[in-house]
């Protein structure tokens, strides 16, 4: 039995909890969330890593991620949320964003998502017996660092928030990888509920002592005798840490202990790395890690590393002082997060294992070659790096790249298109089109950077950071096309959040990126045979394009096709059967084939359409045709939306299909009387007249049928005036 849980059951015999704050639940709408992965699950609740897709995004995570805890209604205890509210401003717990309920009354708690963290239960430092003398100072320093963090954070929760955790064990304390002085901070999770503050504060301190012993590799689960626990305190610890742990385990523990520990200035007595113990005696230090351990933090370690130094199974490795040469194969392939704060030796291809996903090299400033950074790395920190970058040095798996000291010209393609967050805090070179990848959403540049040229900042950027100040960008950068430049617009997800890039030269195959969905080329008039449009494109607008279309030239999944200048015969399957929105503003050539998928058709001012020529599938038709009184109005049997913006003459009886519900006529409509010929199906009518006065309104009142519920004249809705 776990002594921590057992002791909790023995001590916690009184329950006191009072809180008068009202809980406000929002509606939890499932379709507004995407579940990325399940983190934990039991009979009472399930915890997910989730992403907010729609509605207000209350997270501060760069990807919109947060932790969502779903609690079944029958197991919900409001004290859990009240605790979160009370701890809302405490930096040692997960940030609380809010709570919600679904239609089944299940409760959802929205919390901060920590990308890089390790439970303390998986962090153990166990030196081999043969090297324990050489390892003493390293071990003591690590214990000192972690102890100070734990004592400080727990004291803050007790003193500032008057809350007891009540469930302290290694699994409920996270070491969070961050950019603080020592590279980590502490977060407490999974607070127990219904715990009285005064009755149970000593329980937290006792359990903290057990956690410290367990972190040293000693077993606290087989004996509940406190004297036995004292015997578990490692002999090689310095006396002051033995005293700290002894105080925490004492039967006479009280609220003053944490204050006494902090007042003894343990946290301020930490030696700096430069003054810590030097290198051990000759020979290598072998650090054994338990099979179920993930993390290893060695702030003083600076010994040569061989293949036996670190055993396979280490997930997180932090060597703050290490600055020796690394050889291929000495870093275990199990490493996912690697931090080498002082390292500045040349990295040869293969030195960093392909398992690494987060790589932090804040002091590195040597030349990088292809393969120095392995494929698979997603977060790359090179704070001091200021060497030339060429194509393929930064792998295309990297999504977060921090180059705070970098100030070299960036060639096109040197930054991978996978990036979503980029820091160039010292960059003062001119930014050319296409240098900043198009999926970037967060960009950091110096305040005194070179002036931005058109298209140098992708319109997908939503956060621009300069000198630490964040500028929110809500709209795409306005395009100035006076010089007839080509520009390309694209979007990763939706058409209305497009990214805009300027192309100052001829468009090439390399200009069109994989994953492109929105594509607009303002002056493009080349053959698609020389420049295939990516199959991912769904929206294609080519204002100047006037080349013949043949089958299979256009992407098979395209939905919106806008060709305002196109004037060639349309035959066979030249228009893909996926198109639903089709625009030809200048077309007057033969239309032999339009796919039945088309719902919106715009044929501009030139094309003459005879009755029956429109497809039965067309629901919306727009044309600027200038009509004579004898000209029949084109329609299809299914047409519901008809826009004839140049129609300014008499409406003949039966001239408008009885299926049309929305009708737009010309801006100078002259025959108000003929409006009486509108079919009863029309409910929405728009047109323009020379003068809108009381007489005109009276005439419209006289001739427009009461079935028309919305009338807009000269862009002014007048239905209410008529009524």
Swiss-Prot record:
In which domain of life is the source organism classified? Answer: Eukaryota
Q: Which GO terms describe its molecular function?
A: ATP binding; protein kinase activity
* FNIP repeat locations: 301-342, 343-384, 385-426, 524-565, 566-606, 647-690
Keywords in alphabetical order, please. Repeat
**Ranges of residues in domain Protein kinase:** 33-276
Matching Pfam families: FNIP
Q: Which SMART domains match?
A: S_TKc (SM00220)
Q: Which PROSITE patterns match?
A: PROTEIN_KINASE_DOM
User: What is said about the domains?
Assistant: The protein kinase domain is predicted to be catalytically inactive.
Family note: Belongs to the protein kinase superfamily. STE Ser/Thr protein kinase family.
**What's the protein called, per UniProt?**
Probable inactive serine/threonine-protein kinase fnkD
Q: Which organism is it from?
A: Dictyostelium discoideum
């Amino acid at each position: 039995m776990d002594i921590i849980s057992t002791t909790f059951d023995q001590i916690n015999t009184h329950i006191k909890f009072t809180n008068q704050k009202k809980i406000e639940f929002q509606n939890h709408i499932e379709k507004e969330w995407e579940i990325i992965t399940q983190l934990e699950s039991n009979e009472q609740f399930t915890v997910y890593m989730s992403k907010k897709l729609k509605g207000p995004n209350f997270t501060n995570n760069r990807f919109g991620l947060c932790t969502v805890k779903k609690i079944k209604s029958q197991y919900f205890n409001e004290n859990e949320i009240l605790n979160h509210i009370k701890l809302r401003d405490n930096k040692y717990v997960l940030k609380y964003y809010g709570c919600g309920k679904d239609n089944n009354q299940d409760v959802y708690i929205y919390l901060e998502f920590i990308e890089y963290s390790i439970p303390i239960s998986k962090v153990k430092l166990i030196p081999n017996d043969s090297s324990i003398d050489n390892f003493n100072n390293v071990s003591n320093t690590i214990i000192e660092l972690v102890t100070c963090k734990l004592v400080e954070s727990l004291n803050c929760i007790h003193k500032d928030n008057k809350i007891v955790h009540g469930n302290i064990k290694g699994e409920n304390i996270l070491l969070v990888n961050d950019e603080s002085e020592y590279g980590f901070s502490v977060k407490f999770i999974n607070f127990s509920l219904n715990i009285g503050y005064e009755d149970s504060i000593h329980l937290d301190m006792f359990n903290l002592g057990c956690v410290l012993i367990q972190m040293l590799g000693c077993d606290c689960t087989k004996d509940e005798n406190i004297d036995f626990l004292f015997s578990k305190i490692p002999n090689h610890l310095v006396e002051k840490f033995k005293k700290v742990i002894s105080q925490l385990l004492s039967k006479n523990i009280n609220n003053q202990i944490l204050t006494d520990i902090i007042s003894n200035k343990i946290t301020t007595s930490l030696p700096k790395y430069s003054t810590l113990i030097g290198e051990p005696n000759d020979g290598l230090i072998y650090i054994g890690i338990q099979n179920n351990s993930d993390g290893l933090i060695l702030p003083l370690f600076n010994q040569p590393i061989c293949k036996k130094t670190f055993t396979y199974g280490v997930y997180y490795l932090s060597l703050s002082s290490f600055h020796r040469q690394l050889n291929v194969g000495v870093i275990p392939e199990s490493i996912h997060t690697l931090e080498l704060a002082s390292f500045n030796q040349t990295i040869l291809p293969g030195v960093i294992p392909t398992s690494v996903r987060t790589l932090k090299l804040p002091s590195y400033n040597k030349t990088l070659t292809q393969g120095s950074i392995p494929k698979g790395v997603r977060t790359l920190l090179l704070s001091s790096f200021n060497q030339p970058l060429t194509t393929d040095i930064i792998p295309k798996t990297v999504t977060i790249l921090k180059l705070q000291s970098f100030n070299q010209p960036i060639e096109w393609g040197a930054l991978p298109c996978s990036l979503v967050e980029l820091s160039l805090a010292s960059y003062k070179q001119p930014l050319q089109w296409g240098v900043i990848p198009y999926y970037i959403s967060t960009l950091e540049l110096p305040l005194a950077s070179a002036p931005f040229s058109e298209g140098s900042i992708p319109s997908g950027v939503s956060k621009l950071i300069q000198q630490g100040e964040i500028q929110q960008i809500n709209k795409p950068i306005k395009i100035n096309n006076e010089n007839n430049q080509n520009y390309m617009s694209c979007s990763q997800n939706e058409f209305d959040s497009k990214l805009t890039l300027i192309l100052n030269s001829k468009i090439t195959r390399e200009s069109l990126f994989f994953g492109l969905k929105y594509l607009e080329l303002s002056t493009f008039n080349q053959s698609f045979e020389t420049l295939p449009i990516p199959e991912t494109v769904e929206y294609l607008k080519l204002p100047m394009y006037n080349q013949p279309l043949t089958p299979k030239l256009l992407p098979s999944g395209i939905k919106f096709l806008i060709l305002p200048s196109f004037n060639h015969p349309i035959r066979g399957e030249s228009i893909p059967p996926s198109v639903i929105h089709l625009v030809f503003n200048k077309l007057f050539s033969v239309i032999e084939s339009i796919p039945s998928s088309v719902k919106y058709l715009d044929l501009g001012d030139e094309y003459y359409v005879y009755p029956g020529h429109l497809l039965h599938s067309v629901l919306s038709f727009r044309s600027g045709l200038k009509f004579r009184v004898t000209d029949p109005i084109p329609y299809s049997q299914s047409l519901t939306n008809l826009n004839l913006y140049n129609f300014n003459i008499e409406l003949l009886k039966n001239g408008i299909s009885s299926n049309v519900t929305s009708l737009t006529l010309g801006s100078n409509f002259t025959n108000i009387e003929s409006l009486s010929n509108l079919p009863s199906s029309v409910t929405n009518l728009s047109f323009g007249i020379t003068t809108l006065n009381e007489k005109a309104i009276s005439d419209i009142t006289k001739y427009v049928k009461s079935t028309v519920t919305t009338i807009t004249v000269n862009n002014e809705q007048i239905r209410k005036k008529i009524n």
